[in-house]
């Protein structure tokens, strides 16, 4: 029997505790779960891809069946096929996420009909946390520790140390 392989993608700019929770839950559904840090052309980047990779790897190091990858110039379906993935895993916080993901799923099915998409609902405690809100809090120098893994705080400290 072949391994069940999933792919959870995002820009993770920055990663939130909601992301970590979804990935932990998804990791229990697969033999191998890839977490793909993808460059999103519709979003302006706060952290570099390299910084995001450090953040995500540290936040997920306790998950033995999870491997973090990055991609800047490929469609998720191309990466998924190369990795032998059977399913995309996506998190849903609200109806706006569902609308966005339904549109993405349409194109994923058009391009890679053999792949399934599994939607996991965010836990209520994480439904109002978004990377864009976290970036706004960072811009106004607010405490974000309740919303992000410690690796985000460490990366911000590293960036501040480099500036000083």
From Swiss-Prot:
What this protein catalyses is: (R)-4'-phosphopantetheine + ATP + H(+) = 3'-dephospho-CoA + diphosphate
Q: Which residues bind substrate?
A: 11, 43, 76, 90
Q: Which cofactor does it need?
A: Mg(2+)
Transmembrane intervals? none
Q: Quick check: keyword Magnesium in the entry?
A: yes
* InterPro entries (alphabetical): Cyt_trans-like, PPAT, Rossmann-like_a/b/a_fold
Task: Extract the signal peptide range.
Answer: none
* Pathway info: Cofactor biosynthesis; coenzyme A biosynthesis; CoA from (R)-pantothenate: step 4/5
- UniProt GO MF annotations: ATP binding; pantetheine-phosphate adenylyltransferase activity
Describe the protein's quaternary organization and the partners it interacts with: Homohexamer.
Q: Which PANTHER family match?
A: PHOSPHOPANTETHEINE ADENYLYLTRANSFERASE
Mind telling me what this protein is named?
A: Phosphopantetheine adenylyltransferase
Q: Which organism is it from?
A: Streptococcus sanguinis (strain SK36)
């Amino acid at each position: 029997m072949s391994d069940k392989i999933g792919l959870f993608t995002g820009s993770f700019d920055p990663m939130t505790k909601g992301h970590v929770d979804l990935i932990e839950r998804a990791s229990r559904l697969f033999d191998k779960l890839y977490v793909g840090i993808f460059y999103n052309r519709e979003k302006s980047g706060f952290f570099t891809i390299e910084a995001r990779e450090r953040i995500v790897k540290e936040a997920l190091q306790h998950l033995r069946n999870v491997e973090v990858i990055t991609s800047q110039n490929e469609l998720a379906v191309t990466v998924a096929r190369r990795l032998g993935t059977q399913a995309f895993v996506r998190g849903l916080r609200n109806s706006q996420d569902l609308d966005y993901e339904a549109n993405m799923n349409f194109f994923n099915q058009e391009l890679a009909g053999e792949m399934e998409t599994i939607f996991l609902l965010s836990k209520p405690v994480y439904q109002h946390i978004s990377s864009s809100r976290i970036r706004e809090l960072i811009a106004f120098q607010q405490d974000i520790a309740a919303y992000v893994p410690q690796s985000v705080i460490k990366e911000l400290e590293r960036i501040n140390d480099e500036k000083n």
